[in-house]
Amino acid sequence: MKITEKLEQHRQTSGKPTYSFEYFVPKTTQGVQNLYDRMDRMYEASLPQFIDITWNAGGGRLSHLSTDLVATAQSVLGLETCMHLTCTNMPISMIDDALENAYHSGCQNILALRGDPPRDAENWTPVEGGFQYAKDLIKYIKSKYGDHFAIGVAGYPECHPELPNKDVKLDLEYLKQKIDAGGDFIITQMFYDVDNFINWCSQVRAAGMDVPIIPGIMPITTYAAFLRRAQWGQISIPQHFSSRLDPIKDDDELVRDIGTNLIVEMCQKLLDSGYVSHLHIYTMNLEKAPLMILERLNILPTESEFNAHPLAVLPWRKSLNPKRKNEEVRPIFWKRRPYSYVARTSQWAVDEFPNGRFGDSSSPAFGDLDLCGSDLIRQSANKCLELWSTPTSINDVAFLVINYLNGNLKCLPWSDIPINDEINPIKAHLIELNQHSIITINSQPQVNGIRSNDKIHGWGPKDGYVYQKQYLEFMLPKTKLPKLIDTLKNNEFLTYFAIDSQGDLLSNHPDNSKSNAVTWGIFPGREILQPTIVEKISFLAWKEEFYHILNEWKLNMNKYDKPHSAQFIQSLIDDYCLVNIVDNDYISPDDQIHSILLSL
């Protein structure tokens, strides 16, 4: 959705101020993965109206990362995204590529900028075959895409740094040209002089510009960064900022606390001015400072606002990619690997995403693992060692999983996202299984008719009821598999799939081609929703991915000359099978799966 539409929609239904976050593209692959996790956590904590991603001009890897970040934010994280686009080092061919990628990812918002001079240049000069001014870029976007994109422009409350003599009148003329060219909203440069900003807003309105004015808010984290950023932007520092920060400049913690209070006072004055109802926070890819500002302003969402958010309509985050608009069902196997699931289904057409059925002959095939990129494990090889050390026994792996279940580890090779409170009803049993060398991979507890607004298990529209069958996926020594199968042979409630790295599949599923709904919800005036399933075809695709993850982990060990760990992980691949069991008796409180596995 366009930013302008979102802000107007919110204005008509609530008088509460809104906000957004800006992130820049990290330089390393590990930094990118860390940023995705941070963006996700900040969304969960605050429900921003949108995020925006800065542009790394000049081509190469970093430019592609800008569009990759936008696509992932839209498609995987379900975040409304605005993409920066600059004229710096950008011939039209590169601009076309960036716009096309944004368009296909579902992004509907562009912040059109001239951009700063390249790092190795003293002055800004246009690139051959590109644009000199932001207004020309705006006109070009409009000519190619019409009204598909809401286009933001930059505003400078203290004038553009390159304008001679701080000519405010001329700067406003340039801003008006960008609005007249098709700009839909203004995001300003950072500032600290709130009185000057309010006066500037009055001049913007007097000049006939009626689009939303969104102030850019820079948190104060350290004294040195505070001075450096003010100097870089050539902005003034009010006396009351200096008088409160100078005496404590060597105490980072106190600077952060007092600095946050100063920014909160500034933001409150902006919101009270009548010109501003939305704050755009420059996060600098940090998490705590922006959330502290919002918390002290008392504008973070209430519990009811969290429950009413449209992305909570399913137990997994709804994608904003238009190709996935019909998606209502996902296999449970990728519950903790949403990035690879979206990648492996990215080639599906709009009408191929299941919205009620899954696993029949008409279902599309999962894409190759190559679609996930060069690495299936999201952490760098060095980070893998830091997180998971060098396991040489099944007890070492069990120790890692138990730490993950207890929240002491945020991820595992096969689990990209942290564990949550959903597992609490079966957590003790999961830990006990791992202590008995049965390595748990994925799970969910039984749920029988909990209200859909429940903090932990709830999802979907309010006033409904949600249900779950208990599900457990685990690694089991092949030597124990015959006894498990024999035990399950006469059990009418427990269904399973078991497979090894060679693809030998065993199952007691009554119809291997049909899906088994393991999560469903009943809501007033709607058909039953069944968003999470277990079925054969997707399990075979997941098995391929899982054993490739183990192999990649092994190769990391070889890379760092850890032969004993590499040999052990190879033994996991060779000697363990991947099993999942569903307890279809969602009413019984007994944990049959746990009891049976402990008896093996």
Curated annotation (Swiss-Prot):
Protein name as it appears in the record: Methylenetetrahydrofolate reductase 2
Keywords in alphabetical order: FAD, Flavoprotein, NADP, Oxidoreductase
Binding site for NAD(+): E22, Y23, F24, V25, P26, K27, T54, W55
Residue positions binding substrate: D116, Q189, Y282
One Gene Ontology cellular component annotation held by this UniProt entry: mitochondrion
Pathway, per record: One-carbon metabolism; tetrahydrofolate interconversion
Catalytic activity: (6S)-5-methyl-5,6,7,8-tetrahydrofolate + NADP(+) = (6R)-5,10-methylene-5,6,7,8-tetrahydrofolate + NADPH + H(+)
